[in-house]
């Protein structure tokens, strides 16, 4: 208990943030020095690593994100197995930063989402909202001998929120500008957009998931080209989008739903990819044309969401992009064309590595959980109140 009190009272902490997203490509780990809280928080990133999932682990996770193929036994074992992977990632990023793991004060571990059900639904006579992220925080804390904050989404769901997106707290702290409105777009498996008016207060922030980013593109790359992703967007660049199919796709139920909203594999997973492929084949599209259409779907759905749900209230002066999608040159070109004349820039222009942003976010959320600082934003998630996010797991003596 004395150690926990000392951790709470300490303003400056060495924190590792861990993020494994819906793209299922592996775990990102960022080691960062954090000091202060809220708008006074200062951040000094020291190292970042990406640890790819072994093929067998990735395939097992993917199998267990599908209700038709998941099993309780597999999910239970994955909860422990992923904690071991996360422990290795902490060791790797500490080595990359050339620091002893014993100097790490805290770990923030998002976990691997296998199911996210933010809309209330009946469960044995009671409506509930629910989410499940694997990578047991107590197992991780025990392996590392370091306190771990995990289970970040449950408190917001308990307050009637979507439990997502959570990155907007980080966006506000790191990117709010006094004299311009900014859009922060993260292109992971899912695309999420944060809108920061000039000098944004917490209640001014708006954010939501716009739809798929890399999730559909990567699935099509696997199906059409036997590749984990479309490198640099080269297959999409070699094709021509089918605008009639694109128009049909943009009429999908999720795109028509008003914020606050969040999404994942339930909406844009294997079943969605099957339907898209079927529609492409009925139009006799080539693999390259199919990839071009799916890539444009990401860019067009982001812009459509901005035009419908953001611009009428708050136009942005620039769009700042992060996540794995920044490496897809075709996707970035399509975004630039859609948002012209608004400039599209990577977060690296502002001192935050695009691949590291989400891992840094969960380091910050863990740091603020120990501070007792509320980090959900009801204007974003729809929750009824603000609350600290995350549960603290502590190692044994």
From Swiss-Prot:
It is an enzyme of class 2 (transferase). Residues 373-384 have a biased composition (Polar residues). Pfam families: AnmK. ATP binds at residues 21-28. Pathway: Amino-sugar metabolism; 1,6-anhydro-N-acetylmuramate degradation; Cell wall biogenesis; peptidoglycan recycling. Its EC number is 2.7.1.170. It comes from the Bacteria. Keywords: ATP-binding, Carbohydrate metabolism, Kinase, Nucleotide-binding, Transferase. InterPro entries: Anhydro_N_Ac-Mur_kinase, ATPase_NBD. Residues 373-397 are annotated as: Disordered. GO terms for molecular function: ATP binding; kinase activity; phosphotransferase activity, alcohol group as acceptor. GO terms for biological process: 1,6-anhydro-N-acetyl-beta-muramic acid catabolic process; amino sugar metabolic process; peptidoglycan turnover. Catalyzes the specific phosphorylation of 1,6-anhydro-N-acetylmuramic acid (anhMurNAc) with the simultaneous cleavage of the 1,6-anhydro ring, generating MurNAc-6-P. Is required for the utilization of anhMurNAc either imported from the medium or derived from its own cell wall murein, and thus plays a role in cell wall recycling. HAMAP family: AnhMurNAc_kinase (MF_01270). Belongs to the anhydro-N-acetylmuramic acid kinase family. This is Anhydro-N-acetylmuramic acid kinase. It comes from Salinibacter ruber (strain DSM 13855 / M31).
